[in-house]
From Swiss-Prot:
Domain of life, source organism: Bacteria
InterPro entries: PhnH-like_sp, Phosphonate_metab_PhnH
Protein source organism: Stutzerimonas stutzeri (Pseudomonas stutzeri)
Known role: Belongs to an operon involved in hypophosphite oxidation. Exact function not known.
Protein name in UniProt: Putative C-P lyase subunit protein HtxG
Biological-process GO terms, alphabetical: organic phosphonate metabolic process
TM annotation in the entry: none
Record-linked NCBIfam families: PhnH_redo
Family: Belongs to the PhnH family.
Gene3D superfamilies on file: Bacterial phosphonate metabolism protein PhnH (3.40.50.11310)
Length: 195
């Protein structure tokens, strides 16, 4: 990555870009692509950027509550985000690790306000490895296959229970390294034949 002098940007400078509006606007467009094409792996971050942190700097602000049961964010990052800390049950955004199930149910929204269901931002090991998830639903022409490793199989049962009464439910943003894939609550996951 080059800075305005044409020199390669230092890692600290590259990491700082995620706090700036132009980078967040680009990331927002990339995230909207991921939401529009469920299960498609989309490159989000580059260089020294953290895709997990870039998702948060792009989508959350001081009006949002964030649950970080992983303690994945530093106190400096939390301060810069300006979010309120909340429990998993009360937060609009929940950080999760694919290897550990949540011990509480995130917000599912209501019939009057289904958009108040939480967005779970989940760290996973890797895309392109692991079980084949066969996805169908809005934004998917016939079927999309997503391979992802580092997710406890119990997550799919939890997600199914949370999203059983559409339009209530949660949306998942899976994050691995510099890439993301989104599983909106409208996406159906078929694990049969997963290998």
């Amino acid at each position: 990555m080059m800075n305005e002098t044409g020199m390669a940007a230092a890692p600290a400078e590259a990491a700082w870009r995620i706090w700036q509006a132009p980078r967040q606007q680009t990331a927002f467009r990339q995230l909207m692509t991921a939401f529009s094409y469920p299960g498609r792996v989309v490159p989000l971050a580059d260089g020294a950027e953290s895709a997990l942190l870039l998702v948060l700097t792009t989508l959350v602000d001081s009006a949002c509550a964030l649950a970080d049961p992983l303690h994945a964010l530093s106190s400096d990052d939390l301060r810069r985000l300006g979010v309120r800390s909340a429990s998993v049950e009360a937060a609009e955004f929940v950080l999760a690790d694919g290897n550990r199930l949540l011990e509480a149910t995130p917000r599912l929204g209501s019939l009057e306000n289904p958009e108040q269901g939480a967005t779970v931002v989940m760290r996973v090991s890797r895309f392109g490895e692991g079980p084949h998830l066969r996805l169908t639903g809005p934004g998917i022409q016939h079927e999309q296959v997503l391979q992802v490793s580092g997710i406890d199989p119990g997550w799919w049962k939890q997600r199914s229970e949370w999203n059983a009464h559409f339009p209530l439910g949660v949306d998942l943003i899976l994050v691995s390294g510099h890439e993301v894939a989104v599983l909106p609550r409208t996406t159906h996951i078929n694990l049969k034949g997963a290998h």
